[in-house]
Amino acid sequence: RLVRFLAKAGIFKAPLAGPLLKAMHHVPVDRIDGSASMRQAVRLAKKGELVGVFSEGTISRSFEIRSMKSGASRIAYEAGVPVIPQVIFGSQRLWTKGHKKNLGRTKTPVFITALEPYYPTGDAEADTAEIRRRMQEALEGLWEQYEAEFGPMPAGEYWVPARKVGGAPTLDEAEA
């Protein structure tokens, strides 16, 4: 099955990305009034489609799990489907705002893990907090996996989280 990602509406107007996103049937989200995209996401999930939601609402500059919006748990609850959280670490080495893009065959390790399905209870805030807790735990596991395979993360590097003595902003700095 293909994933139908929710993405901010402005990207759908971009000359290259817009037509691609539309052709792949992704869902534009109006950040002021997202009710139409929420309804569409619930309809898709009820039909058995996979709906991809970046619950943080943006890319975290801290490379940690930042505060999350409750849309994913609300969509899943209304559709009667689970949330299957995904955690990624390493992609920031390929493309981070303000840094040189590192595309092509770079052999840069990128770790992705899918967590166990979580069935929302209907308490969107509590569900979102629990999903975030599980994602943070998984991210810390990816850090351990990275260090087990490649040694300690290099201190001061822009792509390394501050908590791991890296040069990325702290979670508080990134959210300010």
Residue ranges, per PLM feature:
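Catalytic core of membrane glycerolipid acyltransferases/transacylases, capturing the structured
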Residues: R1-D33, R39-Q40
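Non-catalytic C-terminal accessory region of glycerolipid acyltransferases
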Residues: S35-A176
